Structures are given as structure tokens and as C-alpha cells.
Amino acid sequence: MVDSLATVWLIGGTVDSRAVAEGLIAQGINCLVTVTTSEAKHLYPIHQCLTVHVGALTPQEIPKFLKRHSIAVIVDASHPFAAQITTTVTAIAKEQQIPYIRFERPPLALGKNTLEVPDIQSLTRGKYQPYLRGKRVLLTVGARWLSHFSLLQDEAVLFARILPYPQALAQAIAAGFTSDRIIALRPPVAEPLEKALWQQWQIQGVVTKASGAQGGELVKQKVAEALGVNLIRIARPQTIPGQITDDLSQINQFCQRHLPS
């Protein structure tokens, strides 16, 4: 029997993290989920074993957080591109000898019209930049990354799809996007809407992250193939070697094995 005070810290904010949380609470395991926005809180079911903390944690706050909440196991189900939090937590878990496991679905196979680039710099400043020059390009990389494309505003017709938040809009405008080249949509975006948007803007290329099917990448692959549009996928950042799985049952077993009884 698991110690009733022992808690699993689930780094969440993703659809995958909801599945992880549901698996843990089904076993009666106390689960504390952290998310960075109040909207993400609604991903999770209401349950006596589940608590959701809203707000980002700094590296300095995490050790106190672990102690205050009696964290015995850490499950990282953050976004594949949330490399900073993964790197930070991995180091702290090792230092404090807290069992750590990461849940991450494998990347999708490359589609027929998909080109993968190693990082955003190779696309905006490196050898893949010609794929953007002179083209009508839709950027679906998140508002925080739009500044990387600022210097290309005079070399391509760039459009940005962002989340419907004031901060995201401010970041897009600061990166040089005018109101007629910005659309705010909350995912998931259905295939017909995705296709209609690309056609409306006469898109010739789309830049996305390798976020997997849950991140809408599969829909983009289908639309790219249907319309003959080039899809440029930014590869996931390299993860620190360690415990990682895409099997929910392994997450459950890991927690059961490492939680004190």
C-alpha cells in the first residue's frame, strides 16, 4: 500500500499529462500537477487525489516546493520543446535523489511534403533559410519564437498563428507582424479549418514544431500533402539521457515501485 502522504509531482500542461494523471489517480496515488496557465487547469478531472498548482516555478523555488509537498516521485509530461524545465528538474531530481521519469510520445514519421531542420537557427539564419525567402509562409511555432523571424520580414511574406492571449499578440506585433497577418486560434485545429486557412492566405510553406499528433502535426502533414505545401518541421531538442517512456503503464509501475509504502 502506498504511503498516503507521498505525492507524485506531475509536470503538466499537455494533453498527454492528463492521461498520466488519470492513470495515477485511478490507483489512488496522490498527484500534484503544475501548469503555467489557468486555462491548462481545466485539462484535469476533479478528484480527491489530484491537486493542480497554477504558476511557473523558478529553479530556486523547486527544492522548497518538493519538500513542502512531500514529493517522492517526479513525472515530467511537459511539452517536448519545454527543454529548460526538463533540464532543470532532471538536475534537481538527481541532486536530491528523487526518482524521475519522463513521458514523451515519439515524434511522427516525416510526411511526404515534410522537411525536418535541426533547430530554429538553421532555418532563420542558416542553410535552410532559402526555403522561406520569397514565399508566403505560415508560422505555427508559438509566439515566443516569432522574434527569430523578424529579420526575414522583408524577404518573405510571413503569417503567424498564435494562441488567443494578449501577451502572444504583443509578441507577434513586436516581431513585426501586422494585424492582417496574425490569426489567434486555440488548438486543436480541425483539418477543414486548417486547410481553409492555408488556402485563404495562399500559403506556400508552413513552419511547425515536431510536437506529434497531439500538437496538431498530423493534421498539418495531411493538409500539406493535399495542397502541395511544404511543411518544415523543427526537430525536438535533444533530451538528457535518462528514464523516458511513451508507455503509460510504465509510468504507473515506476510510481508504484518508487513511492514509499
UniProtKB/Swiss-Prot annotation:
A molecular function (GO) held by this record is: precorrin-6A reductase activity
The reply to whether Oxidoreductase figures as a keyword in the UniProt entry is yes
Q: Which PROSITE patterns match?
A: COBK_CBIJ (PS51014)
* Pathway involvement of the protein, from the record: Cofactor biosynthesis; adenosylcobalamin biosynthesis; cob(II)yrinate a,c-diamide from sirohydrochlorin (anaerobic route): step 7/10
Q: So what does this thing catalyse?
A: Co-precorrin-6B + NAD(+) = Co-precorrin-6A + NADH + H(+)
Q: What is its EC number?
A: 1.3.1.106
| Keyword line | Cobalamin biosynthesis, NAD, Oxidoreductase
Q: Which domain of life does the protein's organism represent?
A: Bacteria
InterPro entries for the chain: Precorrin-6x_reduct
Provide a GO biological process annotation. Answer: cobalamin biosynthetic process
- Function statement: Catalyzes the reduction of the macrocycle of cobalt-precorrin-6A to cobalt-precorrin-6B.
Name the record gives this protein: Cobalt-precorrin-6A reductase
